[in-house]
Design a protein with these regions (language model features):
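Alpha-helix capping/helix-boundary segments
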Residues: 8, 40, 85, 107-108, ...
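Residues that scaffold the ATP/ADP-binding catalytic core of kinase and kinase-like folds
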Residues: 11-12, 47, 88-89, 130, ...
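Conserved beta-strand termini and adjacent loop/short-helix elements that scaffold enzyme active sites
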Residues: 37, 81-83, 122, 137
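Acidic-residue sensor for enzyme active/binding pockets
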Residues: 43
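Active-site neighborhoods of divalent-metal-dependent phosphate/nucleic-acid chemistry enzymes
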Residues: 46-52, 72-120
């Protein structure tokens, strides 16, 4: 099973489908094996709020609609931060304290580790130092699950 990083989930936006048709088709075929971290929802909601603050209500509404659809599609596969995950975040933060890894990436990596998932991300350099199995589906699309 896989955990989708926010930069992969963002490809579900209709405006980005043309950039990743193989990935979108793979995600549709393997949807039941894909999970999200609550941090992805946090990042997407923050993006909606930023767009509104910047006076881009139409784009904000599009992304808000995408978040709603994602929450429906992934209802039972949005993984919360439990105590074990939170403690793993702290350990990863200490491991990378000199590398300034952002908290959202630490939470997503810890969530993948906690649940034994492979992280799908475009940010291989950011996650490779965290010791979490990860792959870039634009370079190496997984086989169907």
């Amino acid at each position: 099973m896989y955990l989708l990083d926010t930069n992969i989930v963002s490809m579900l936006d209709q405006r980005r489908h043309a950039h990743a048709p193989e990935l979108i088709a793979w995600m549709k075929r393997n949807g039941g094996s894909l999970c999200l971290s609550v941090m992805t929802i946090t990042e997407m909601d923050a993006g909606v709020l930023k767009l509104r603050r910047e006076g881009k209500p139409d784009r904000a509404d599009q992304i808000a609609g995408l978040v709603t659809a994602i929450l429906t599609d992934f209802a039972d596969r949005v993984l919360a931060v439990d105590l074990e995950t939170a403690r793993h975040v702290a350990r990863l933060g200490e491991l990378t304290h000199r590398q300034a890894v952002e908290l959202p990436d630490l939470v997503i990596a810890a969530t993948a580790a906690r649940h034994g998932l492979i992280l799908l991300t475009r940010n291989m350099s950011g996650f490779s130092r965290l010791g979490v199995p990860a792959r870039d589906p634009f370079v190496d699309l997984p086989t169907d699950v």
